[in-house]
Amino acid sequence: MTGSKLDIEYYQQTSPWTLNGEKIPVVDENEHLGLVVSGLQEEERNIDANIASCRKSLFALLGPCYSFKCLLTPTVQTHLWCTYNLPVLCSGLASLPIRPAIMSPIVVFHHKILRSFLKLSSSSPIPALYFLLGQLPIEAKLHLDFLSLFFTIWNNQHTTIHKVVMYILQMSDNSSITWAAHLRTLCLKYRLPDPLKLLKNEQAWSKQRWSELTKTMITVYHEPEQRLKARRNSKMDYLNVQLQGLSGKPHPALLNVSNTQDIPKLRQHLKMLTGDYLTAERLALDTGSNPKCKLCLAPTENIDHILTKCRATADIKQRMLPELLNSVAIAQPDCIILNLPTQAQYLTQFILDCTSPNLPGNCRIAAHNPLVGTIFHVSRHWCFAASQSRGRLLKQLNKLKH
């Protein structure tokens, strides 16, 4: 038997239940239909149990697919995650009123998973995770499942649960912590029709109509919110997400990865694109150290310096620039990046994301251009070569010092 704290104390001490002369044990929690039933912190305990189950499914079923050395693309890993593991993480939570105050553990776990796909550090910007993979936050996924469960109740108008939900919606106010009151809060948040009116006055819609409406309204809510966070994040100067969405389509930088040799190059490209690459300038902001370049003694070492201006790695630019311009000339011959004056101003941004709204319209490559993948292929190779050359020279410099 389970219950609230008062119930537990009452039945343990004052009036215990008995069966055949023996006391019925009173426990803090129990399992029923895959959920942890508890009078104390029920939502938190179910979230912790689901995280543990999801972690087991990650390593037991597809462990090699998610390892750091795995050479699957982030898009393939994300597809496997959404198909096999995300349902385990969200299983049963639609029947509980999961509020923002208790959602932190599952949100942190979700961020950790997405970062592992993109091979980004724990300090990488969160909006970049969502927009690169085209994925909604875990909060939105839980709310979609929650509203899908409401549709099931709405569609079965002769059941007891339909009457119970309607009664609670009629009697409860905004301070209620019931499932039905949480449903009303979500409908207000996402500008969905009032659930009480739907239960009272309307026949259930088709499943497709309700699913499309909820998915659209939830996406419309979260996209501007994440774009605002991206604009305020100093690390995302090169990753402009104003034209990116959270409807499942990945960023063009993740597409057209044709072989396993591109995967290590993609990792360096994404770290530079998201501002997660550790430069002397970034280190100076965090620790107060000297931001100058250790290789060429320039006053500031940042992403722009590493890719296009460092004299110590100038051979990388000399080798990669003609290859990049040849790819651009084939994909979009009128692109102004082919002009020398424009290169100095926009070259770094073009290398990291040639489809970015940061670039002028006549310098930007359309994301739907069938040859944009060839440009990103050169960009990945450029970022990887610059990073490898820089790392090798820094190691040689450290050996000379010692």
Where do the protein language model's features map onto the residues?
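Short, conserved micro-motifs composed of acidic
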Residues: M1-D28, A49
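Structural motif
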Residues: K23-V27, F68-Y84, S123-S124, L132, ...
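Short, conserved catalytic/metal-binding micro-motifs enriched in Asp/Glu and His
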Residues: N30-L40, C54, L80, Y84-I98, ...
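Short, solvent-exposed helix-loop connector elements
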Residues: S38-N46, A60-H79, S91-S104, P127
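Short helix-capping/linker segments at secondary-structure and domain boundaries
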Residues: Q41-E44, V88-I102, D276-A280, H381-S387, ...
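Family-specific functional microsites
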Residues: P64, F68, M236-H402
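Short coil/turn segments at secondary-structure boundaries
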Residues: S67, G92-P97, S123-F131, L142-D145, ...
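Acidic catalytic cores of enzymes that act on phosphate-bearing nucleotides/polynucleotides
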Residues: P105, F109-H110, R115-K271
